[in-house]
Amino acid sequence: MSVKISGKDYAGMYGPTKGDRVRLADTDLIIEIEEDYTVYGDECKFGGGKSIRDGMGQSPSAARDDKVLDLVITNAIIFDTWGIVKGDIGIKDGKIAGIGKAGNPKVMSGVSEDLIIGASTEVITGEGLIVTPGGIDTHIHFICPQQIETALFSGITTMIGGGTGPADGTNATTCTPGAFNIRKMLEAAEDFPVNLGFLGKGNASFETPLIEQIEAGAIGLKLHEDWGTTPKAIDTCLKVADLFDVQVAIHTDTLNEAGFVENTIAAIAGRTIHTYHTEGAGGGHAPDIIKIASRMNVLPSSTNPTMPFTVNTLDEHLDMLMVCHHLDSKVKEDVAFADSRIRPETIAAEDILHDMGVFSMMSSDSQAMGRVGEVIIRTWQTAHKMKLQRGALPGEKSGCDNIRAKRYLAKYTINPAITHGISQYVGSLEKGKIADLVLWKPAMFGVKPEMIIKGGFIIAGRMGDANASIPTPQPVIYKNMFGAFGKAKYGTCVTFVSKASLENGVVEKMGLQRKVLPVQGCRNISKKYMVHNNATPEIEVDPETYEVKVDGEIITCEPLKVLPMAQRYFLF
C-alpha cells in the first residue's frame, strides 16, 4: 500500500528531492538537486516512531565486519563539484564508505552494498542539511595557534602554509624555514583539530638549503619577495621541487627589482607553480602579475581581502600592507611600495576572472592581509556579486546556479587539494577519501556550519549551555567536540609531509602520534587539472591605466555597497 503526500510535506520529513531548489544563505544563488539516491517509501529516518529501528531500517543481524557503517548521515543534500544530489552518506573507519541509499537490505529496496546500517552505526539526521567537503586553505601564515579553531569553526578542515608564530618573518611570509623550525611545527601540529602541512623557505640560489627542508618534512617550498624572489631563486626552487615531487608557491617581486613578470615567467620555464594572490594587491609584479594566470602551468589563487570588490576594499588595504610587510609610513619609498600594489582596476578584474574560471583557488592569507575565518564566506559573496553583475553563466539551467556553485565550491575544496598533492585523501566527497565533512543549514550556508566531521568523527559544532536539559538553549556557540580531544585527534586529523621525509625516517624519529601521509603528484599537473576553473584566456594589463583585457576585451565591475552573508549573521 502506498501513500501520496505533497512535495512540501515530503521535504519537511525527508528533505528536498530531485528537482527541488535551495537558496544558499541570503544570497541570490540557487542550487537544484540533480539526483535522489534514496528510495521513495524506504527512506531511512531516525527518531521515535521512525524507520531506523531493529529489523526495520537497521539490520538485526549484520555485525561490524559485515560492511556495517560506523556513521550514516541520512537524506542529506550532498553538494560537491561532481554533482548536487540527495542521499545517504556512509562512513566507516574514518573514510567515506559510499554515497547512495543506506539501510537494511533484508527489508528495504535499493540499499547500497557498502551502506548497511546495524547496531554499530551512529546516525546524524541530514534531512534539510547541505553537506560539503571540508574546506582547504593553502595560504596560512601560522602566526598564532588560535587561527586554527577560527578556521575550523568556519568549515576549514585542512590548513597549508608556513610560519613559526608572531615572528616578523612569519607575519610577512608563508615559510617555516629550516629543519629545526619544521620539526617544532610538526610537533606542535599534534595538538590541533585540523589537517596540517608546512611550506619551507624556497628562496636560495643553491639547492642544498632547500633539499634539507624537504627532507625534514616540508610539503613544499614558498618563494616570497621579502626574501628575494629572483630568477635564480625561482629556478633553483623549482629544480628541487621537481626532484622531490612537492609544490612551489610564489609571491613575486612587486618592485620589479630583479626583473618583470616576463622574467619571472621565463624563470619558471613552463614548470608547475602555485601563484599566491595572483591579482597583485597581496604582492607581486606591479602592475601586471595578473597576466600570469593565462599560463597553463600556473595554478592561480586569490587571498580573501580583495574578494569580492566592495566600496571598502581599497581603504583598508594600505594600513594592512604597512603592518604586514614591516613598512614605515614615514618613509616615502615604503608608502610608494604599498600604493603600487593597490589597483582598483586589477581588483575589479579579479572578481570576473574567478567567475570565468581563470582563477582556480581561494585562500585566506591569515593575519597577513587576510581573514582566516572568511575563506568560505568571501567565496560565496563573490559568486553572489558576479551573478548580480554578470547574470547566469553559459549553459546554466534557468532559475538555478549549479554550474556557478560547483565552480566556486571547487576553489576551496578539490583544486587546492590537487595543487598540493593531497587530493587522493581530501577535497571531495568520494568513496575511500578521509571523511572530512561540513554540515550546513541552508539559511546558514557558508557562514555558520551546523557541525564539522573530521576523519569520520564529530570534531566541532554549535552547542548550547552544557548545564541545560537539552543541547539547544542559549548561549549557542562553537565548541570542540570529542574528536578534538585525547588520542582521538591523532586518528581524526592528518599531518601531511614530503615523501622523502617518510622514506628517510626523519618523521618516524620525531615520534609523532598523528596520522602522517605523504603529498604526491604535485609536479605532473597543470591548469587543465583545475576542476571547473581551468580557463586560460589571453590577459593584458595597460601599464598606464591598469585596465585589464581578456582576449582583447576590457573587463571590469563596480564595487558593491552591500553584501549578503554579512552583518545580519553576526549580531551576536
UniProtKB/Swiss-Prot annotation:
SUPFAM superfamilies documented for this protein: Composite domain of metallo-dependent hydrolases, Metallo-dependent hydrolases
Binding-site list for Ni(2+) 2? K222, H251, H277
The pathway it acts in is: Nitrogen metabolism; urea degradation; CO(2) and NH(3) from urea (urease route): step 1/1
- Tell me where on the tree of life, at the top rank, the source sits: Bacteria
- State the PROSITE patterns in the record: UREASE_2 (PS00145), UREASE_3 (PS51368)
Which InterPro entries has this protein been placed in? Amidohydro-rel (IPR006680), Metal-dep_hydrolase_composite (IPR011059), Metal_Hydrolase (IPR032466), Urease_alpha_N_dom (IPR011612), Urease_alpha_subunit (IPR050112), Urease_AS (IPR017950), Urease_asu (IPR005848), Urease_asu_c (IPR017951)
Chain positions recorded as Ni(2+) 1 binding sites: H139, H141, K222, D365
User: How the cofactor binds, per note?
Assistant: Binds 2 nickel ions per subunit.
GO biological process, alphabetically ordered: urea catabolic process
Co-factor(s): Ni cation
Major localisation:
cytoplasm
Q: Which reaction does it catalyse?
A: urea + 2 H2O + H(+) = hydrogencarbonate + 2 NH4(+)
Give the matching Gene3D superfamilies: Metal-dependent hydrolases, Urease, subunit C, domain 1
Q: Name one GO cellular component term.
A: cytoplasm
Q: Name one GO molecular function term.
A: urease activity
Q: Which residues form the active site?
A: H325 (proton donor)
Quaternary data = Heterotrimer of UreA (gamma), UreB (beta) and UreC (alpha) subunits. Three heterotrimers associate to form the active enzyme.
According to its UniProt record, which protein family does this protein belong to? Belongs to the metallo-dependent hydrolases superfamily. Urease alpha subunit family.
* Name of the protein in its database record: Urease subunit alpha
The record lists the lineage as: Bacteria, Bacillati, Bacillota, Clostridia, Eubacteriales
